[in-house]
C-alpha cells in the first residue's frame, strides 16, 4: 500500500508518496512534489522527483488557481507515460497536515464531513493555513473518491499541556471563548521526541527533553515522558521565539501604541508576521544563512540580529527547563537547527553548569540524527532531521491499520 501526504500552505504545497512494507512506512518517499505559488507573477513553480533522482520541472500553473488546479500533478502518479502506479487504487490513504485543530483534536483523525466543517470553523485561528488544507482535502477527495483521508494536526501534540501552561493571564471568559495557547510544530516535536528515545536507546516514557524546531518558524517544547508540558508558540504561531520574519513575543503595549498612532490592524499584522524577526532587525533577509554571511563580512545589524535570535532562544530554553524536573537531552531540528553549527554553538555556550556541552568537531561536521555532546556531558545534545511528511504518513498508516 502507498500513503500520499499533502502539506499545503498559504503560498506553497509539498507532497510525498510513501511505500509501506509489512505495515511500516519506508523512511524515504518514492515520489515528491513541491509547488511555489510565489515563484513569478502569474506563474507557479512546480517540481517533482523520484527516489534517487533530482528535481524535474512539471508543467506550470497559475498562482491564482491555487491548489485546486493541481489535479494533473497528482494524476501523473497513476496516469500517463512513466506513471509510478498502475492505478489510483494503489494509494491506500491520504494524510494531510492541518495546522490548527483547536482544542477539538488530540490525535490523527479520519476526515469526515464533520471534521471538515470543524477545520473550516477554525480558519480564523489559522487564516493562512487551514484554507489551504481544506483545498487539498477537497481536491484529493475529488481525485480519489472512496480513499480514506486523515488529518494530522500540528496543534494536537500540545493539547494535553497543564492549564497553567495553556492559559493566558487574561479574563477567564476569554479562555471560554477559545483564546488559549495551542502550540504548533507538534508533528515534528513529537517525531523528535520519539527519535531521541531511539538514539539514546532509552524508553521515551522516562525521558525529559527540550526540542528546538528552528526554521523560518521557530518553537520549543518541553517534553516529559513523551508528552508536551510547555511550548513557546501560543494562540497563533506568532508567539514565542524570534523567527525568520516573525517577531515572536513582544510587549503588547507596543502594539496598542502603534494602533493609537494610526497604524491599521492589517499593517500591524503584516509587519509582525512578514517584516520582523531576522529580516526586520538585520534589514537583509529572513534566511539565517544570509544573516551569518553578512555577519562574517562585518555587517553590524546582521550581528545584532544573530545575537538577538540567540539571546531569545537561550532565554526560552531556560523557561522550558522550568517545566521539567531534570533534562536528559536538548534536541535541535528544522532548517536552522539541523544546518547551522554557529546557532547550536551559541545556544549551548557556557551551559556546562546545566550539564550541556557540545563537541565542536561533531557540531561542525554536518551531523544528522546523532549526538554531538562531549563524551562526559550529563545532558546529551542531539541533531534530528525534521521528517514531518514521514511522520504524517506513519500516523495515517497507524490510524488506518487500527493501531
Swiss-Prot record:
Residues involved in Mg(2+) binding: 7, 388
Biochemical pathway: Metabolic intermediate biosynthesis; acetyl-CoA biosynthesis; acetyl-CoA from acetate: step 1/2
PROSITE patterns, per the entry: ACETATE_KINASE_1, ACETATE_KINASE_2
Gene Ontology BP annotations: acetate metabolic process; acetyl-CoA biosynthetic process
Co-factor binding details: Mg(2+). Can also accept Mn(2+).
Residues annotated as binding substrate: 97
Catalytic activity: acetate + ATP = acetyl phosphate + ADP
Signal sequence extent: none
Localization annotation: Cytoplasm
Chain positions recorded as ATP binding sites: 14, 213-217, 287-289, 335-339
Keyword vocabulary terms for this entry: ATP-binding, Cytoplasm, Kinase, Magnesium, Metal-binding, Nucleotide-binding, Transferase
A Pfam family reported for this protein in Swiss-Prot or TrEMBL: Acetate_kinase
GO molecular function: acetate kinase activity; ATP binding; magnesium ion binding
Assembly, per entry: Homodimer.
Stated role: Catalyzes the formation of acetyl phosphate from acetate and ATP. Can also catalyze the reverse reaction.
Protein name (Swiss-Prot/TrEMBL): Acetate kinase
Lineage: Bacteria, Bacillati, Cyanobacteriota, Cyanophyceae, Synechococcales
Amino acid at each position: 500500500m502507498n500513503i500520499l501526504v499533502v502539506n499545503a500552505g498559504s503560498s506553497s504545497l509539498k507532497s510525498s508518496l510513501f511505500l509501506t512494507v509489512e505495515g511500516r512506512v519506508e523512511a524515504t518517499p518514492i515520489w515528491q512534489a513541491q509547488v511555489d505559488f510565489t515563484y513569478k507573477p502569474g506563474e507557479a513553480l512546480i517540481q517533482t522527483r523520484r527516489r534517487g533522482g533530482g528535481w524535474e520541472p512539471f508543467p506550470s500553473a497559475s498562482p491564482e488557481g491555487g491548489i485546486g488546479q493541481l489535479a494533473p500533478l497528482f494524476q501523473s502518479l497513476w496516469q500517463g507515460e512513466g506513471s509510478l502506479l498502475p492505478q489510483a487504487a494503489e494509494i491506500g490513504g491520504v494524510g494531510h497536515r492541518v495546522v490548527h485543530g483547536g482544542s477539538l483534536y488530540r490525535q490523527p483523525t479520519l476526515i469526515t464531513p464533520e471534521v471538515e466543517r470543524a477545520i473550516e470553523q477554525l480558519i480564523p485561528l489559522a487564516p493562512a493555513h487551514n484554507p489551504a488544507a481544506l483545498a487539498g482535502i477537497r481536491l484529493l477527495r475529488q481525485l480519489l473518491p472512496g480513499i480514506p483521508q486523515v488529518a494530522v494536526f500540528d496543534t494536537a501534540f500540545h493539547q494535553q499541556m497543564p492549564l497553567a501552561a495553556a492559559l493566558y493571564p487574561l479574563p477567564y471568559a476569554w479562555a471560554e471563548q477559545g483564546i488559549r495557547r495551542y502550540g504548533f510544530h507538534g508533528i515534528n516535536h513529537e517525531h523528535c521526541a520519539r527519535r531521541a528515545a531511539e538514539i539514546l536507546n532509552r524508553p521515551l516514557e522516562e525521558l525529559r527533553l527540550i526540542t528546538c524546531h528552528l526554521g523560518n518558524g521557530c518553537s520549543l517544547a518541553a517534553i516529559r515522558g513523551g508528552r508536551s508540558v510547555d511550548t513557546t508558540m501560543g494562540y497563533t504561531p506568532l508567539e514565542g521565539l524570534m523567527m525568520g520574519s516573525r517577531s515572536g513575543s513582544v510587549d503588547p503595549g507596543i502594539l496598542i501604541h502603534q494602533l493609537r498612532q494610526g497604524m491599521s490592524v492589517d499593517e500591524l499584522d503584516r509587519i509582525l508576521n512578514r517584516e520582523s524577526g531576522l529580516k526586520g532587525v538585520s534589514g537583509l533577509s529572513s534566511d539565517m544563512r544570509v544573516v551569518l554571511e553578512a555577519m562574517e563580512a562585518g555587517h553590524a545589524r546582521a550581528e545584532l540580529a544573530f545575537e538577538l535570535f540567540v539571546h531569545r532562544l537561550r532565554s526560552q530554553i531556560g523557561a522550558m527547563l522550568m517545566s521539567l524536573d531534570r533534562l536528559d537531552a536538548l534536541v535541535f531540528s528544522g532548517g536552522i537547527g539541523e544546518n547551522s553549527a554557529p546557532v547550536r554553538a551559541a545556544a549551548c555556550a557556557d551551559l556546562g553548569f546545566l550539564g550541556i556541552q557540545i563537541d565542536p568537531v561533531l557540531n561542525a561536521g554536518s551531523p544528522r540524527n546523532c549526538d554531538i555532546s562531549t563524551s562526559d556531558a550529563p545532558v546529551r545534545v542531539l541533531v534530528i532531521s525534521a521528517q514531518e511528511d514521514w511522520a504524517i504518513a506513519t500516523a495515517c498508516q497507524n490510524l488506518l491499520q487500527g493501531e
